[in-house]
Amino acid sequence: MKKNKGIVVLLLTAIITVFLCYTAGIGLGPTGTGSAKNIKTGLDLSGGVSITYQAKESNPSAEDMSDTVYKLQKRVEQYSTEAQVYKEGSDRIAVEIPGVTDADAILNDLGKPGSLCFITMTDDDGNANFSSTGSGYVLARSLDEIRESGSVVLEGTDVKDAQGGAFQSDKNSSREYAVSLTLTDEGKTKFADATEANVGKQIAIVYDNQILSAPKVNEAITGGQAQITGMSSVEEAQNLASYIRIGSLSIELEELRSSVVAAQLGEEAISTSVMAGLIGLVIVIIFMIIMYRLPGVVAGVALILYTAIVLITLNAFDITLTLPGIAGIILGIGMAVDANVIIYARIQEEIASGNSVRASIKSGFSKAFSAIFDGNITTLIASLVLMWLGSGTVKGFAYTLALGIVVSMFTALVVSRFVMNALYAVGFHDEKFYGRAKQRKVFNVVGKRKVFFIISIILILSGPVAMAIHHNVDGTALNYALDFSGGTATTVTFNEDMDIKQIDSEVTPVVEEVTGDKNVQPTKVVGTNQVVIKTRTLSQEEREKLDNALVEKFNVDDSLITTESISSTVSSEMRRDAVIAVIIATICMLLYIWFRFKDIRFATSAVVALMHDVLVVLGFYVIARVSVGNTFIACMLTIVGYSINGTIVIFDRIREALATKSRTEDLKDLVNRCITQTLTRTLYTNITTFIMVVVLYILGVSSIKEFAAPLMVGIVCGAYTSVCITGALWYVMKTKIGAKAATVSNGTKAIADTKKAEQVDSSEAPADGNTAKSGKKKGKKKSFKDKKKKNK
């Protein structure tokens, strides 16, 4: 790069950085477009809308209520991945949607959960079930009569999903609008029989005795997927899909009440989190400058750009930010720092080996690429799986994590490279600006592996032992929060309006004293004097004590205090989704590492190290009695990301060293050397991330502290695992386990026995390296087509 070009690059970088920071901080135009203040936040940070539904039928079954909660959860995720749906009492369902303030608009858009069915034009005797009015369709007789005649071919519960959207017509390349239906296994069979018998006829979709649409059957639909075509606009398609989804609930619901609720953590939660983030970021940048000099300045610019881009993107894509979302951003900052540390440590190593500064910069970026790429792609794969299969908190975390990974790779591999080369081009040639790696004494980690393994076993077993003790003493192994265990909701109408800060300081202590619950969750109903206080499940005696305490302390009217049992906001189905998502994500990471490193032992060691960190942090939750709720899921997923990233950095060094290994070098010495070479990266990355979390812990509100404390333990544990466990574990697997098995690596053969494995040849080293369309125009009749058959 020429000097003039370098000056241009630096000027452009400065201008873009200032512009992005201004956009993220203040925003553009009168509405502040792009500003962080416009980011949609969750119920915990900014409040939202609360809607309570009542089941129409008396005494609905627990199974139907659970199924309805799960389906409603999926339904409201279109507004926010952080929306919460839970059971209230035996026949009510509460829906809480963050970031919105108009309850009526949500109710209109969400639709009234009623009955849905699909009916044929006529019954077997030829009696008409519905007729056209010119502008629509009406039932020709009562729905009860239609049911008795056997004309109902599908019920709402036979519909698995419905999505409205646009597609390109095959016939004339015009834009068409349709609703895509996915049926259950039972619905697939029913609809196949019905459409086969009614080709050329209409099947009407009836919602609460009103005909929404009456598409014509073009062909037998046997694949369980269909499209309703002929819509005049995408809004019409989405509206019909919305009615079908809400009508597919297991039970009919009616709105009982709706309200706007304030932030659960209060406004100070956002301000303290922002302040903690800024302070932490400044400390991290100063640390990087002290450790890496000029490259540290470049890292600071990259981190500032990372933060600004993430905030702007969160705003642009309307992603809801909650505590778990903040976890994803913190993990992203850690990975952004990690990428820069890997690069700059490599540059200093190259300078120490006698290369010129220019050659060292080029070689540093080149050699660091594989570790950065593999570490980030592995975590990105996990986040995409969690995004795909997860729900609620898991999905929200996955969105912010995926965003952070993509942005961190861009700032480290693109921005940092351009700025570093530009600085060199304008005259920063002296190695004193970059530093030189110090020669470290090689640590005999592998030789002391038994000691480290024993320490790890003790740490891992401490969790189950503590769980058993608490289970016998308290009856619960873990200190479950309301998110997981459910509890009691007490609604109180006070004599005066109280803000959340006043509620926390005056009301919450009274509730904690009476109930002994340290995880009280008060929520203010905006525009009223009402406060909803959620606690653990209270007995009738405890409820009466709480009522008396509130009356005595605040002189409230006893008749204005109501209590209701509530279910967990994380339903069993959501927990199932989370577990399945994590298992599949882990398998995908294992397969990717196996593919990239050409040795299953690398992948197996990485997963074992991952489980080690998760179990140690779980032990901390048990011993410290930290409440297990939504933030628990986010914390564990963050630990998984850190663990796998740190492991891959060391394995990348081992892979590189194996490619140039001499026949005389002992494998144990090679692993020890690689661990020592990556020690700087491990320490610096964990220190910088630890700083961010410590500041968050010091300045944050109580809920944030409960999230930050286990995360700090996880970071420390991750550093220990990276240095003391991963390399030694791979060495054991390489030399003791499967030494006689074939190794997947460029057609080479595995070592026949343990002794030969100690002198593995370098040649064994792994290489581095659906829709069917109707084509109908506006005004024409709608029709059913087999989506699955068309895709084939």
Enumerate the predicted regions with their spans.
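A structural signal for conserved, well-ordered secondary-structure elements
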Residues: M1-K792
